[in-house]
């Protein structure tokens, strides 16, 4: 009873803090960039991280298994993963260029997890025999860390496409400034002077706005590539460990289960992204389109099976819980 109450308190505290963080971030964009607001936002995300960590540890203690057995627990772990991705850039250079992506993603996943749709999953249950394995922590945690990284990288690619096509189509409006201000990357440090001269040739000498926009798109492309590469690595480890676990549990490494099929499709999409990103003929827009497609595929892979409750991976799904 004590652990359940503590988990309930930590859930509401973390959700309240991250809501305040998003409000601060919006005020920072609408009013002006102030150090005080930025610091408050970062401290809020750290507090959210510790609250969700405490929540997961508490659930782990009283359930006696790693909290990744149903949709509710996986959503909370996904929100925890977003908070980690949020803090990494800040600790590296004290500038968070991902706050416009990670904070809304964290509140969306946690909000859905704590909604009335998943109320019955809030109470921990005994693991089914197939999930009583040491591979549970390895496989599911790697997949969810991969999903979080791939989603963040894909959203950066979506932002790149929005900025690029608004410029190409010549769409006016203040939203350009709002979108550009959402990603405080600052000045790009070019690896060599040749790269810098290439950037200057592609923008007008007298157009600082175009130069800054081009800098932003290049930085978005670079950050998207790095985060997606990390997520692709996590997903690969997760799929391989899942195959070993499947062989132990079901006697086969691969069964073309709906979850496995969509995981393979997701992996293939981002493998194509990495290939096009390293190809000189496809730059910026081409890989960004592929990554944007991957954003939708990830949600189909993650929510599709869990919401429909079909296949071998339907443990703790929404459909089974509702029934």
UniProtKB/Swiss-Prot annotation:
The chain crosses the membrane at residues 9-29, 45-62, 71-91, 98-118, 143-163, 227-247, 261-275, 285-305. It is a multi-pass membrane protein. The keyword Iron-sulfur does not apply. Its main location: plastid. Required during biogenesis of c-type cytochromes (cytochrome c6 and cytochrome f) at the step of heme attachment. GO terms for cellular component: chloroplast thylakoid membrane; plasma membrane. This is Cytochrome c biogenesis protein CcsA. Belongs to the CcmF/CycK/Ccl1/NrfE/CcsA family. NCBIfam families: cytochr_II_ccsB. It holds the Pfam family Cytochrom_C_asm. One of its GO terms (biological process) is cytochrome complex assembly. It comes from the Eukaryota. It is found in: Plastid, Chloroplast thylakoid membrane. HAMAP family: CytC_CcsA (MF_01391). May interact with Ccs1. Keywords: Chloroplast, Cytochrome c-type biogenesis, Membrane, Plastid, Thylakoid, Transmembrane, Transmembrane helix. GO terms for molecular function: heme binding.
């Amino acid at each position: 009873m004590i652990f359940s109450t503590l988990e309930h308190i930590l859930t509401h505290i973390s959700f309240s803090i991250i809501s305040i963080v998003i409000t601060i971030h919006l005020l920072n964009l609408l009013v002006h960039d102030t150090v005080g607001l930025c610091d408050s936002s970062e401290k809020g995300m750290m507090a959210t991280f510790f609250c969700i960590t405490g929540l997961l540890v508490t659930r782990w203690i009283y359930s006696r298994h790693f909290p990744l057995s149903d949709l509710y627990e996986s959503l909370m772990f996904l929100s925890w993963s977003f908070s980690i991705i949020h803090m990494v850039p800040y600790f590296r250079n004290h500038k968070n260029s991902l706050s416009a992506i990670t904070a809304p993603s964290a509140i969306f996943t946690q909000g859905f997890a704590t909604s009335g749709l998943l109320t019955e999953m809030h109470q921990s249950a005994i693991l089914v025999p197939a999930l009583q394995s040491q591979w549970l922590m390895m496989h599911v945690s790697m997949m969810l860390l991969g999903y979080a990284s791939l989603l963040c990288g894909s959203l950066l690619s979506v932002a790149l496409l929005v900025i690029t096509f608004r410029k190409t189509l010549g769409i006016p409006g203040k939203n350009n400034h709002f979108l550009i201000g959402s990603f405080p990357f600052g000045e790009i440090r070019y690896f060599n002077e040749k790269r810098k001269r290439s950037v200057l040739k592609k923008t007008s000498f007298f157009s600082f706005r175009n130069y800054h926009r081009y800098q932003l798109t290049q930085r978005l492309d670079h950050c998207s590539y790095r985060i997606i590469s990390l997520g692709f690595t996590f997903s690969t480890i997760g799929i391989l460990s899942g195959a070993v676990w499947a062989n132990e549990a079901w006697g086969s490494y691969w069964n073309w289960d709906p979850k496995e099929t969509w995981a393979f499709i997701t992996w293939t999409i981002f493998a194509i992204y990495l290939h096009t990103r390293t190809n000189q003929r496809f730059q910026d827009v081409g890989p960004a389109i592929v990554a944007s497609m991957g954003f939708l595929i990830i949600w189909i892979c993650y929510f599709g099976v869990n919401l429909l409750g079909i296949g071998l991976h339907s443990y703790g799904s929404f459909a089974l819980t509702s029934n």
